[in-house]
Structure formats: C-alpha cells, structure tokens
Amino acid sequence: MARNVLYPLYQLGGPQLRVFRTNFFIQLVRPGTAQPEDTVQFRIPMEMTRVDLRNYLEQIYNVPVAAVRTRVQHGSNRRRDHKNVRIKKPDYKVAYVQLAHGQTFTFPDLFPEKDPRSPEPLEEELPQQRQSSDLRCPGIPSWFGL
C-alpha cells in the first residue's frame, strides 16, 4: 500500500539565506505599578515561553536579557451581553524582562501635555474671524452654508 508523502515545499535559495519571521507579536506595556529601571513589561501570547521571549529579544532586537519572569493574567468575566450571558475576555500572558547589567529602560512619554493657550490671543483673533467671513452674504453666520 502506498502512502502519501509530503515533501517540503521548495524555496529558492539556501536555508541560511532565508529570513525567519516569527508568528509571535509582543506588546510593550506601561507598568501599572512602579518597577525598577532595568525591568520591562510585555504582553505576550499564551503559547510563547520564556526561552522564546529571550531568543526573540536577543536575536531580533539585540537586547541583552538577564532574566525573564512570566505570569498568566485571566481575562475579565464581568460583562454580559443582551441575553445576560457572561462575556469573558481572553487570557493573556504577562512577561517581566530584566535587562542585563547596566541596561535601563524608561517608558517614553508619547503624549506630552501641551500648555493651554491663554485667552488673550483668542480675543484678538475673534474680530479677524468675523471680518474674514463671506462678504457676499453679510449677516449670515458662516456655519449656515449654502
């Protein structure tokens, strides 16, 4: 009896020349509580192990890693739908990566607070805006478009 044999798919070029891309996506997360400067928090898939994360950071991003600690965060189970059935968010894994000696990481300030504009320039701009309205239809507000 003959069996169906699956041969590996032919790809052009040697295996050393191919670029390996992982199926994992990791998220850098701002920690909720204060952590040491050499510790970084990630949200990783449930299938990813400590060794996978260490290799991911060291091989792809050239980040020296001293230790990796993981925990499973259970998803929230409080929401209910229109039939009063509980809706559970999926579980996810949280990884705490301790960087090698001398390495520090501070989370970037992505949204710096802007200084609120003083009201004086607004008062100066108001007459200019009134004059710049459409001169063909005086007395009609600009929001009332034709």
Swiss-Prot record:
- Primary subcellular site in the record, as a coarse category: mitochondrion
Q: Does the keyword Ribonucleoprotein apply?
A: yes
Gene Ontology terms: biological process:
mitochondrial translation; translation
Q: Which domain of life is it from?
A: Eukaryota
Q: Which family does it belong to?
A: Belongs to the universal ribosomal protein uL23 family.
For whether the record's keyword set contains Protein transport, the answer is no
One GO term in the molecular function aspect is: structural constituent of ribosome
* Chain intervals for the UniProt region annotation (Disordered): 108-138
- Return the protein name: Large ribosomal subunit protein uL23m
Q: How does it assemble?
A: Component of the mitochondrial ribosome large subunit (39S) which comprises a 16S rRNA and about 50 distinct proteins.
Cellular localization per UniProt: Mitochondrion
Compositional bias segments (type: Basic and acidic residues): 111-120
Task: Report the GO terms under cellular component.
Answer: cytosolic ribosome; mitochondrial inner membrane; mitochondrial large ribosomal subunit; mitochondrion
User: Pfam families given for it?
Assistant: Ribosomal_L23
The gene from which this protein is expressed is: Mrpl23
Q: Which UniProt keywords apply?
A: Mitochondrion, Ribonucleoprotein, Ribosomal protein
Q: Which species is listed as the source? A: Mus musculus
What InterPro entries does the record tag this protein with? Nucleotide-bd_a/b_plait_sf, Ribosomal_uL23-like, Ribosomal_uL23/eL15/eS24_sf
